[in-house]
Every structure is written in structure tokens, then in C-alpha cells.
Amino acid sequence: MDETGNLTVSSATCHDTIDDFRNQVYSTLYSMISVVGFFGNGFVLYVLIKTYHKKSAFQVYMINLAVADLLCVCTLPLRVVYYVHKGIWLFGDFLCRLSTYALYVNLYCSIFFMTAMSFFRCIAIVFPVQNINLVTQKKARFVCVGIWIFVILTSSPFLMAKPQKDEKNNTKCFEPPQDNQTKNHVLVLHYVSLFVGFIIPFVIIIVCYTMIILTLLKKSMKKNLSSHKKAIGMIMVVTAAFLVSFMPYHIQRTIHLHFLHNETKPCDSVLRMQKSVVITLSLAASNCCFDPLLYFFSGGNFRKRLSTFRKHSLSSVTYVPRKKASLPEKGEEICKV
């Protein structure tokens, strides 16, 4: 949970903190993720919308992934300002809760969208006959709406969390729970999200990718080479996202929440735990940067869309008005198809 972002040193004998490390790492990495995520996903979303006449189920998932990423990266600058000001929140209680909420909506929407894409790509390759009826744009929209509703509702406790204040009555954001009752509630939420939001999807993609790889090995690589490349690209990017962004974060969060329940916390253990939180939470936020790679390497159609978009853009730049009786430009014809 994002409230585990900063662990307060509770040992009376420990006066060291990682505040400087935390503020520098978070402000630097969140700034980089904001820029890369905003321009990467913004560009992909712009191209997909401009070429929306070329509809596909894969495109529906890509659009939803890009929207989820953009909603998250738009709140990351608030975190950057917070850590630049050394842990003083300047934007009010609601934006504090919204910033936490947006990160987790993005995190689990990304996991579920990637899982859905992997499942339907598996159906398309392993069961090509059933693929005709199962992998459709309409079903993809239905799945995406279901994912949004589920994640938005299950993440709602972050919007209802009580604000925290320091001794100077400044609003504190992204802090760990202090009272035992809140710690227990957070622990329950953690295990629900761990199993439903990470372990089950991870098992699904492992099964799907195993079936895809076995099927591709049986088939001649010369046949459907484009489809094979897209499948391999998706396997590489999604696996990297799970291993780099999602898995370290969920493992560390489990350890951290149980660590909070310990009455005695050695100083060196507290400092190591704090640093591990900073690193893994930053890696979790970096999933926004993986998704543009997924669009490019696993979506052959996306590269065709990009080519169409570039041709249309060039034709718009070089377009010279003609008489009404003249034929339309080639770029205009492509855009209207």
C-alpha cells in the first residue's frame, strides 16, 4: 500500500533517517517516470485515436492501458513537489488521497489489462478456431469496462483514508499507518490485492505463455511469422513488467507490513526497510514506462498505424489547396478508409 511509502523509525535508540535518500530518489525517479510515461503513452494514445478506423481487440486494450498510465503520471508531479519540499504536502487532503488512489488504480489496471491481453493472445494462437468468436472488439470493450469498475471500487478505501498531520499540523502524505486497527485493515487489503491483483494474474500469464511457446514450437516459424513475433514481443515485455515492477513491490510490501507489527525494530533493519520501500515503490510506478514498449513490440498493427499516421501527417504538411473538381490527396484517402 502506498501508505507504506515512508517508514517512521520507531526505535528510541535510532536517530538516523533516510530522508535525504528518500527525497532525492523519489523526486528524481518520479520526474523521469512522469516525462517518459506522459510522452510515451500520450504519443501512443494519439496515434491510436488518429487511426481508430482500424479497429481491433488489441487496440482496445492498448488504449485503456495508455489512459490508465496517463491518469497516473499526471499525479506523479504532485509527489515530486512533496519530496522536493522534504515531505511537506501543499495540495490539500483530497489530492493527497487522490494521488495514492491513482497509483493503485494504474498498478492493478495495468496488471489486469496485461493479463487479459495475454489470455486472448493465447486463445488466438492455441485455439485459432475459437478465436473468431472469442477475441472480438466488443468482448474486449466489455472486459475493459469490467476491469475499470472492479479496480475503481476495490481501490476506493484510499479515497476515504483519514489525513495525517505532523507536530506542526502539516499534512503528511504516503505515510505508513500508525495505529494497530489501521495496520490490520491495511494488512487485509494487502492480502486481497496480493492474491487477486498479482498472484492469480501471474499464474494465468505463466500458463498462457507456456501454452503459446509450446504451440509456436510445434508450428513452422515460416508460417504466420508476424503473429509469432507479436506473441514473443508480448511475452518479453509483460514478463519484464511483472518481474521488474510488480513482483519486487508485492514481495517487499508483504515483508514491510509484517515488519510494522513488530514491537522492537533494530535501527539497521528499519533503515534497510525504508530504502527497500523507496526502491520497490519506484519500480512499481515505472510500469507506466513498460506499456509503450508493449504497444510497439507486440503490436505489429501499431507499427502499421504509425506508418499510416506518418503518411497522413506528411500529406497534411505538403497539402496544397486545389479546385473542388480535383481528386483528394493520397494521404486524405488513407485517413478516410
UniProtKB/Swiss-Prot annotation:
GO terms for cellular component: membrane; plasma membrane. Residues 50-57, 128-141, 215-230, 298-337 are cytoplasmic. It is found in: Cell membrane. Its main location: membrane. Widely expressed, with highest levels in spleen and peripheral blood leukocytes. Lower expression in several tissues, such as lung (mostly in smooth muscle bundles and alveolar macrophages), placenta, small intestine, pancreas, colon and heart. Disulfide bonds join 96-173. Residues 1-28, 79-106, 163-193, 252-276 are extracellular. Signal peptide: none annotated. It is a multi-pass membrane protein. Keywords: Cell membrane, Disulfide bond, G-protein coupled receptor, Glycoprotein, Membrane, Receptor, Transducer, Transmembrane, Transmembrane helix. The chain crosses the membrane at residues 29-49, 58-78, 107-127, 142-162, 194-214, 231-251, 277-297. GO terms for molecular function: cysteinyl leukotriene receptor activity; G protein-coupled peptide receptor activity; leukotriene receptor activity. Glycans are attached at residues 6, 169, 180, 262. It holds the Pfam family 7tm_1. One of its GO terms (biological process) is cell surface receptor signaling pathway. Selective antagonists, such as montelukast (Singulair), zafirlukast (Accolate) and pranlukast (Onon), are used in the treatment of the asthma crisis. Receptor for cysteinyl leukotrienes mediating bronchoconstriction of individuals with and without asthma. Stimulation by LTD4 results in the contraction and proliferation of smooth muscle, edema, eosinophil migration and damage to the mucus layer in the lung. This response is mediated via a G-protein that activates a phosphatidylinositol-calcium second messenger system. The rank order of affinities for the leukotrienes is LTD4 >> LTE4 = LTC4 >> LTB4. Belongs to the G-protein coupled receptor 1 family. This is Cysteinyl leukotriene receptor 1. It comes from Homo sapiens (Human).
